[in-house]
Amino acid sequence: MAINVNTNVSAMTAQRYLNHAAEGQQKSMERLSSGYKINSAKDDAAGLQISNRLNAQSRGLDMAVKNANDGISIAQVAEGAMNESTNILQRMRDLSLQSANGSNSKAERVAIQEEVTALNDELNRIAETTSFGGNKLLNGTYGTQSFQIGADSGEAVMLSMGSLRSDTSAMGGKSYSAEEGKDASWTVGDKTELKMSYTNKQGEEKELTIKAKQGDDIEQLATYINGQSEDVKASVGEDGKLQVFASTQKVNGEVEFSGNLAGEIGFGDAKDVTVKDIDVTTVAGSQEAVAVIDGALKSVDSQRASLGAFQNRFNHAISNLDNINENVNASNSRIKDTDYAKETTAMTKSQILQQASTSILAQAKQSPSAALSLLG
């Protein structure tokens, strides 16, 4: 083997392996201290890009879960208020039935009306004050809002809430009353047919035909109407006037009356009536109030059902988001996180190689000194 002084190849080789071992140890220490095996693009450019996308998706999923929980909270606040509104309407219905009884005097009906008015005011107060984060929920201003329940744009769910004020059309309907009352001696003669045509809430054209019998009185006619249709409700006031009420929850638009009996009864024009207009100081008003409140209860129940479905949907959405997020983070971990068992093994190897390279380098540096012995 040649002995050189100017070029110590053995030392250079040992130095190269020493540097390589030092770099390996430094990289292992970086991975072990950071917890990530990809700390820069030079470690794994493709893996870093995939990891960043997965991280963005995971953060989006976390925010989507928060949004969904906020949506559930809004629905719970609104439904709680609707529950109390339902209790108020049911109490108003009880009072209407009580006032419709013939055992009550005018003064007693006026007293009942005072409670009905107070309940109506509370119904409106609940509608006006129920809010979430400053947003009114039940006074008609909420409208339709979207809830982002996905990690990407376009993954939104819409929630609509209408007004629960007692003066809205959803809390009432149209009332039709005979222009003239029938006394107790009135009965159906040879004109026995009454037809009612309307469009129901589902958009279907309906025609209700009442076949009365000669000798039937006005109360029996109201019974026939109620027995053949859930969409319209009939009652008779103390003045003998037949009145028909069609809730906006059952009927779209107006009811048209025809048939030879319709002419004899003589229905007047449609009149818009809501819970706000309830007047239980008369038998006729009390009976109509029951029909009006039934429609209002259906309106509230319909909104509550929508909120219940909304909450259930969001609960399932949250479960799905959590499952997706778990798998996304697991994938990201496999790509980016440090395998401590593997990395500690690699660091130990680098440390041993570094120590060995250092020892060999020290010996290699002594090789040129052999030339001095030849000169001696």
From Swiss-Prot:
Coiled coil regions, renumbered to chain: 103-128, 310-338
Keywords: Bacterial flagellum, Coiled coil, Secreted
Main location: secreted
Superkingdom, natural source: Bacteria
InterPro entries linked: Flagellin, Flagellin_C, Flagellin_C_sub2, Flagellin_hook_IN_motif, Flagellin_N
CC terms in the record's Gene Ontology section: bacterial-type flagellum; extracellular region
One Pfam family matching this protein: Flagellin_IN
GO molecular-function terms, A-Z: structural molecule activity
Compartments in which it is found: Secreted; Bacterial flagellum
Biological role stated in the UniProt entry: Flagellin is the subunit protein which polymerizes to form the filaments of bacterial flagella. FlaA is not essential for polar flagellar synthesis and swimming motility. Homomer of FlaA is able to form a functional filament.
PANTHER family: FLAGELLIN
Family according to the record: Belongs to the bacterial flagellin family.
Assembly: Heteromer of multiple flagellin subunits including FlaA, FlaB/D, FlaC, FlaE and FlaF.
Further remarks about this protein from its record: V.parahaemolyticus possesses two flagellar systems: a single polar flagellum propels the bacterium in liquid (swimming), while multiple lateral (peritrichous) flagella move the bacterium over surfaces (swarming). The polar flagellum is synthesized constitutively but lateral flagella are produced only under conditions in which the polar flagellum is not functional.
Protein name per its UniProtKB record: Polar flagellin A
Protein source organism: Vibrio parahaemolyticus serotype O3:K6 (strain RIMD 2210633)
Upper lineage: Bacteria, Pseudomonadati, Pseudomonadota, Gammaproteobacteria, Vibrionales
Gene name, Swiss-Prot/TrEMBL: flaA
